[in-house]
Amino acid sequence: MIDQKAQDNFFKNHWRSNIHLFKHSGANLVKVINNLKPKFVIDAGCAINFFKGKIPNLVGYDPVFKKADIMCGHFDAPFKPECADVIIALGSVNWGDSDDVAHMLIKIKSWLKPGGRLYMRGAPGGYKSDKGLQWFLWGMKEINYFARLMDFDLEWVEIEHNTTGSDGGTLPDRFWPHRYVWCYKRKLIK
């Protein structure tokens, strides 16, 4: 069970965005997504809405940050089935156990058109300041498991190492020196 109060507290009081430092899930992802020329993009758990204005036709939702276009969580988001060409979930499917992750992915997949892409980022652990949070421990085994379970094609996986900029960010506070970034593709209906 995900403790929403602990999660909200962590994001409001401890977490700071470091997306500008990320090689595979920061500005470079903008180019990758824009090259697909998507008609509709959902940023699931958009936090500070970093991609807004950089990726056309993007709507971001988040339960904590007011910069979101819609303030809600995964299960309250108002999207219709198979409406999105691309979904970005960079750290928003990192909570709870395997069943919790499966439920979140089922919901997110329901919005993705056949042939659409889901860009994800997950870590094999959390922060020193994340009291009360249950992190899902992502690794290659888990990434492949959910590809099979959700009937996704796994297009690519990259390892993104934690670096720090002049602002320091929260990366020095992480237990693990890296995270995974990957792309699932929803299979076409035959």
Locations of regions flagged by a protein language model:
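Class I (Rossmann-like) S-adenosyl-L-methionine-dependent methyltransferase catalytic domain
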Residues: M1-P78, R117-K190
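A short glycine-rich, Lys/Arg-flanked "PGG" loop and its adjoining helix->strand segment in the class I
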Residues: A102-P114
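Non-membrane alpha-helical structural segments and their capping/turn regions in soluble enzymes
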Residues: S98-A102, L137
